[in-house]
Amino acid sequence: MLLQNSENGNVFDITSVVSDIQITTEIEGQAGKLTFFTLKDDVLKISSGSRLQVKWGDKGIFFGYVFNTQTDKKGNIKVTAYDQLRYLKNTDFYINKGETLAQTFEKECTKFNLQYKIEEDSQYVVPPKLFDGKSIYDILKYSVEANLRGKKKYYIIYDDYGTIKLNNIENLRTGYVIGDYSMATDYRYSKSIDKDTYNQILLFTESKDDSGRIISNQQIAKDSDNQKRWGVLQLAKKVNEKATQQEITDFAKNLLSLYNRERETLTINAIAIPNDNDVWDIRAGAGIFIDISSALGDIGTTQTTDKEGKKAIKREMYIISRCTHALKNENYHTLRLDIIKETMTPQEKAGG
């Protein structure tokens, strides 16, 4: 771990004087975070804004800046650093005149001198919108959600060792299988229809005619079978009065496909395989396979039959919404993963 002091530019290798390293990434709205402990040193000074670089072998795993230091009576010092995504909390005035996500991303990164790279762009032009005093993250989130609704593609913004990248989340899939016989040591799993589950979508518009009367147009999409199982769970949303009937109908169907399901949550504790540098590809936004047998049924696998009538196992891809790598020492590396199904991402909850 290298530290470059923000006040005098001096560079120190602090690998031998730090402990309890944790690196956390989240899929939505949070910067990558590095925390560690060290002791007071007369030579080493950790100032706010100091740059930190962390490598595992030849692989760069964190590049960021010190934002917080704290100490206690015993002289223990806790340091918290964030990657470049922290600067997406900056607020801005921005007029989106109708442009692609990549165009907005490039403009905002350039304005705030952030290193960036566009890995993939959908070329989808989002509707115009004015942002007054909104965070850069919210400005970009608007375009991310518009792409999800308009193109059915989920784009993610993440920091890759000092470069903020825009990418299709499908490109972050890994081949890792985590479960009963691979890495996992404990888990917590739940299924629920109590939150963010709807089997009936009501969309409506409101406008006034020449006499001032309010005219309302409604469109309903529903799943009658699931209503028999769960009762009626309705979500009502007002949409733009300029939307066409076909747009409203399509929007209602899209929302029903997103919300008409049980919500599954899964948290896994795991141990990394020693000397596996690729394990750092397991981060928020990455896709992994799950293979767990639980009291509520198998997680991540389903029994199927192929064309020849033979039984087969189908694996489902899951997305990591939050990931923490914890390093006690070089030989003890653990992970804590919060998992969501690939078919339901946080941005899908945005709706209109």
Could you say what each language-model-derived stretch is?
Residues 1, 45-50, 149-151, 159-160, ...:
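A short, compositionally biased
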Residues 1-9, 163-164, 200-206, 288:
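Short polybasic amphipathic segments
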Residues 1-91, 177-190:
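Assembly/oligomerization scaffold segments
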Residues 17-44, 185-352:
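An acidic/polar, Gly/Ser/Thr-rich interaction patch typically located in mid-to-C-terminal regions
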Residues 34-36, 66, 81, 93-117, ...:
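Amphipathic, non-transmembrane alpha-helical segments in extracytoplasmic/periplasmic proteins
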Residues 56, 168, 292-294:
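Conserved "cap/hinge" positions at secondary-structure junctions
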Residues 65-67, 78-82, 165, 200-204, ...:
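Soluble periplasmic/extracytoplasmic beta-strand elements of cell-envelope proteins
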Residues 76-77, 83-84, 120-196:
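Short beta-strand-centered interaction patches in the first periplasmic/extracellular domains
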